[in-house]
Every structure is written in C-alpha cells, then in structure tokens.
Amino acid sequence: MTYALAAAAAVVFAVLVGSASAETPYEGRKKCSNCHKSEADSWIKTAHAKAVDSLKANRDKEKNKAMLKAKLDPKKDYVKDKDCIGCHVTGFGVEGGYEITEPDKFLIGVGCESCHGAGPDYRKVHRKAGEAFEKSKKVTPRESLVEAGQEFEFIEKCNVCHLNYEGSPWKGAKKPYTPFTPKVDKKYEFDFEKSVRNNKAMHEHFKLAGTFDGPPTPKFHEEFQKDAKPAEIGKEE
C-alpha cells in the first residue's frame, strides 16, 4: 500500500465500527500506545499515521498531481471537509471520535481503533488478562476480546475507504465516493492481501506474549508471528 492508497478514499466520512463499537466511545491511540510501544513507534512512521497530510494545502508536488488527476483543487485545504476527513482520522462521526471543530491529536491519522474498533471495553480485558498472565501465566480466551468489541477481521474496514468509488467491485460502495480510483491512476488499486503485509502502510507486527489463546485470529496471524521480533512493552498510565 503506497501513501497514495492510504490517502485514496478522500471523501468517505465514516469508517466501519465493530458490533460493540456502535455504543462504545473512541478514546484515541494514546491508551493503546502506553502498552504497545513498539507497535506505536512503528505506526507513527506509516502512511496511515500521515494520512491527514494529503488533505493539507501545502502538500508536495506528487500529491498535488494526484489532486489534479482526481479533478480536485490542489490549492485547497480539505482538512475541515466532512466528506474527506473521515478516511484520514479515527472515529469521525462516532462518539468519542475525531471532531473537525476540536481535533484531538491522538485521533489524527488512521489509528489503532480504525482497525481494531473502539477501545475502552476491550482495553480493560487486555489489562486484566495481562495482569493474570504476568502473575501466574494464566491464559485468557481470545473470544473475550471479541465480546468486548475488538475486531479481528479488518478487510471491510479497509474497503470502506480504499474501495468506495463509483463502479467499485466492493458491494458496500456508496456516496460520497472517493475521486481517487484505479481509472484515475493504477496506484489506487487496492489489494488487501498485499497491503496488509506492507509495513510502510501498516505498523510492524511484534511477537505476542501469549496472554490470549484460541479463536478468532486473522488468517495471516501465524505468518506474521513466525518471524516477529520481540516487542518493547510499555506500561498503562
């Protein structure tokens, strides 16, 4: 996934949320980053972290060319455009999510909760399970995270921004459509299987401690964990 792909869905204003996320407020990546330090340090370098930059008026020449191809005004700042901002931030239009009038820096960019769902409920499960594992190596069923609203299948959350264009093969596409389509430029073609393996777009995956066990896991879970490096573990503040 290129930077262009991460910024491709410039006109969709809401991302999909999980089953529990509908009534659970977003809280931003700071809470996640406190414990998942390595993942956070990796994410901040990615295209998803910098997604808002492509909406700013002072974007670079390459991005301005993309704007022209998509028949948008390269001189315009789209950061406050409600039809654009949703795919560049976390939780826009949802309780606790990003607000144009009061932007929270921990909700800027396509952050943790954009993929994993709103975090307050399942974060508590992570904390309790982590304490139990640290104390007695007790393993917690991963299903408990699902019950608390954590998402483990991400493809639809990607599609809602990257495939939301007129004539898209994705059946969920609807107005307002993104103007950044494969017809405008082939670099906007989206392949989930390739993109999810691209560390320039996604954060690097690190070795899990084994706190949770059992289903569900994404189908690429074992592949990523096989060669994953140990993570630097932070502490919840």
Language-model region placement:
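N-terminal export/membrane-targeting signals
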Residues: 1-22
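Sequence context of c-type cytochrome heme-c attachment sites
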Residues: 18-107, 119-151, 183-237
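Helix-to-catalytic-loop junction in kinase catalytic cores
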Residues: 88, 116, 162
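Cysteine-rich micro-motifs
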Residues: 110-113
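Substrate-binding/catalytic groove segments of enzymes
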Residues: 121-123, 166-176
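Repeat-solenoid scaffold signature
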Residues: 139-140, 144-170
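Aromatic- and glycine-enriched pocket-lining scaffold segments that form the walls
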Residues: 160, 173-188
